[in-house]
């Protein structure tokens, strides 16, 4: 694809002799196997997805209370969405939407606001008491209220910024490493060592993509437990 051409986005892209359009279509069609089936027993793919979903729920909701059970579908959906976008963004010529704060804030801020509004609605006095830590001297009360209020409003900012910053840093490292491999192609020894480092870095970024999706949803669950 010619990145300097306006119509370059319509030209077919190839990765390891495989058309990227075909790979994207196969990946999209694969989600059909995760839809509800009319069979009495689930298929192997459906059972695998069900096991994966149950593992996510057990991992995120290790310490919870019965009041947060209704939030399980929402938080699980957010995790699967972030996990899919993060991992698919590592494909060549793929756009990683979660590396932009416009998307991460669009997901994090509404959920954070709804969780805190619910907390103030259910127990207004209890939520106000969190602004003043127990044992605070009287002369520090106004200052602690300001600090705790600022830290409360910093939660959604850090929530979205952490995800976008980690993915952006990882993509920059992959880009710089791949550029170094291309420049050092004439020197086989150095290029081979750089390629090995690049493969290890790519595997690390796959882990980062999974971990960041977990951290995002785990923090949402933590904020939820604080407000219930």
From Swiss-Prot:
Annotated coiled-coil segments of the chain: none
Compartments, as annotated in UniProt: Mitochondrion inner membrane
Quaternary data: F-type ATPases have 2 components, CF(1) - the catalytic core - and CF(0) - the membrane proton channel. CF(1) has five subunits: alpha(3), beta(3), gamma(1), delta(1), epsilon(1). CF(0) has three main subunits: a, b and c.
Role played: Mitochondrial membrane ATP synthase (F(1)F(0) ATP synthase or Complex V) produces ATP from ADP in the presence of a proton gradient across the membrane which is generated by electron transport complexes of the respiratory chain. F-type ATPases consist of two structural domains, F(1) - containing the extramembraneous catalytic core and F(0) - containing the membrane proton channel, linked together by a central stalk and a peripheral stalk. During catalysis, ATP synthesis in the catalytic domain of F(1) is coupled via a rotary mechanism of the central stalk subunits to proton translocation.
GO molecular function, one term: proton-transporting ATP synthase activity, rotational mechanism
Source organism: Pisaster ochraceus
Pfam assignment, any one: ATP-synt_A
GO cellular-component term (any): proton-transporting ATP synthase complex
Record-given protein name: ATP synthase subunit a
Domain of life of the organism encoding this protein: Eukaryota
């Amino acid at each position: 694809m010619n990145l300097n051409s306006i119509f370059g986005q319509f030209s077919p892209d190839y990765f390891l002799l495989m058309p990227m359009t075909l790979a994207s279509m196969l990946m999209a069609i694969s989600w059909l196997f995760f839809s509800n089936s009319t069979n009495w027993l689930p298929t192997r793919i459906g059972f695998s997805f069900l096991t994966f979903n149950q593992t996510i729920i057990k991992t995120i909701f290790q310490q919870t209370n019965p009041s947060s059970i209704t939030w399980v579908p929402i938080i699980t959906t957010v995790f699967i969405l972030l996990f899919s976008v993060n991992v698919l963004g590592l494909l060549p010529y793929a756009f990683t939407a979660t590396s932009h704060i416009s998307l991460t804030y669009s997901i994090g801020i509404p959920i954070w606001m709804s969780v805190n509004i619910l907390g103030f609605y259910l127990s207004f006095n209890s939520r106000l008491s969190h602004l003043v830590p127990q044992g605070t001297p009287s002369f520090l009360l106004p200052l602690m209220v300001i600090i705790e209020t600022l830290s409360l409003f910093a939660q959604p900012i850090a929530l979205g910024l952490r995800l976008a910053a980690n993915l952006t840093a990882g993509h920059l490292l992959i880009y710089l490493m791949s550029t170094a491999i291309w420049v050092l192609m004439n020197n086989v020894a150095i290029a081979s060592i750089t390629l090995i480092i690049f493969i290890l870095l790519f595997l690390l970024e796959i882990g980062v993509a999974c971990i960041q999706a977990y951290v995002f949803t785990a923090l949402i669950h933590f904020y939820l437990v604080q407000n219930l």
